[in-house]
Amino acid sequence: MALSSAKEIIDDIRQGRMVILMDDESRENEGDLIIASEMVTPEAINFMATHGRGLICLTLSKARCKTLNLPLMVQGNNDNFSTPFTISIEAAKYVTTGISASDRAKTVLAAVAPNAKSTDIVMPGHIFPLMAQDGGVLIRAGHTEAGCDVARLAGLEPSSVIVEILNEDGSMARRPQLEIFAEKHGLKLGTIADLIEYRTQQESHIERISEYELNTEYGIFTLVTYRDTIDNQAHFALCKGEIQAKAATLVRVHVKDTLKDILQVGLSQWSLEAAMQRIQTEDGVLVIISQQESPKTLFEKLDMYAKEQPNSPHSGIVQSRNIGLGSQILADLGVKKIRLLSNSNQGYRALSGFGLEVVEYIYD
């Protein structure tokens, strides 16, 4: 089955139709049913519950979550994919038990109404909101962000109802099963990777500011500076040698961390110094992502390191943001194939949407 383009997916969303989105073209991908929230009906909710079989969720922007006064379900999210659940919700009026398809549709419509306010919903309930990251799939390549993006690009409220598609035996449906499902129900099947590519052709959340020759303790690098247009943070790329699209480039994406970079606390295999030394020797690119570190966050990290706990506060959400920003910077520099200096073998979703491919992981 041929995949539908992002434009075709967006056109169907605009017309109130349901679509299926996978991460990318891999046969191992999972898929979600997606429909724009303001187009939802009891029939759509019933279809999702009957045929999708997963957890029916509502993707919302941070701004909408703030309007509805929705708190995150947990503050320190250590889930592998940093799924940002808020407390579940119910419409405050015109519902009974809240679980019926009709009641859930009413809850969705109450939450995304143009004049919606916090008193229009109660907590907990039978609809599970997900808070999307600002910047959408260019920052986090997840179905939460994709749900908001496709609705926004269709000219609708940036919110969708989504549900994972399961097989009849309860296992996750992969691409072969998703193709059969899409053909059976007459639904378009697309990818988040294609949505990323579609958006990068029209917009970016990084702006190249300047370029310098920089003499460091580890040799001379070309320093390229960037500005993040979402939160105005400054990010950097230290480049050594010529970047060639056909050749794999040695890459490290490093997140600025006061305790690790200055106090040398909780160092991983690829510290900032180790990465600079390796790239100075072999040529490549070191991307340095800035992040806001409040005193509270620093104290929490210090306490974590003292207790020898492996995960930092909000590590999953932060990592997703860093992957999106790092990918945009690498694409801007002309990198295509990556030899990644990595501390883990965790795969990265939908990099193909940025025109990137990891061909090798280097651990030491």
Curated annotation (Swiss-Prot):
GO MF annotation list: 3,4-dihydroxy-2-butanone-4-phosphate synthase activity; GTP cyclohydrolase II activity; magnesium ion binding; manganese ion binding
Involved pathway(s): Cofactor biosynthesis; riboflavin biosynthesis; 2-hydroxy-3-oxobutyl phosphate from D-ribulose 5-phosphate: step 1/1
Entry binding sites for D-ribulose 5-phosphate: 27-28, 32, 140-144, 164
Residue ranges of the TM segments: none
Cellular component GO terms, alphabetical: cytosol
EC number from the UniProt entry: 4.1.99.12
Site note Essential for catalytic activity, residues: 126, 164
Cofactor binding notes: Binds 2 divalent metal cations per subunit. Magnesium or manganese.
Binding site residues for Mg(2+) 1: 28
Residues that, per the record, bind Mg(2+) 2: 28, 143
Catalytic activity entry: D-ribulose 5-phosphate = (2S)-2-hydroxy-3-oxobutyl phosphate + formate + H(+)
GO biological process, one term: riboflavin biosynthetic process
Requisite cofactors: Mg(2+); Mn(2+)
Region (DHBP synthase), start-end ranges: 1-201
Stretch list, region GTP cyclohydrolase II-like: 202-364
HAMAP family: RibB
Family matches, as NCBIfam families: PRK14019.1, ribB
Family: In the N-terminal section; belongs to the DHBP synthase family. In the C-terminal section; belongs to the GTP cyclohydrolase II family.
Protein name: 3,4-dihydroxy-2-butanone 4-phosphate synthase
Organism: Photobacterium leiognathi
Gene: ribB
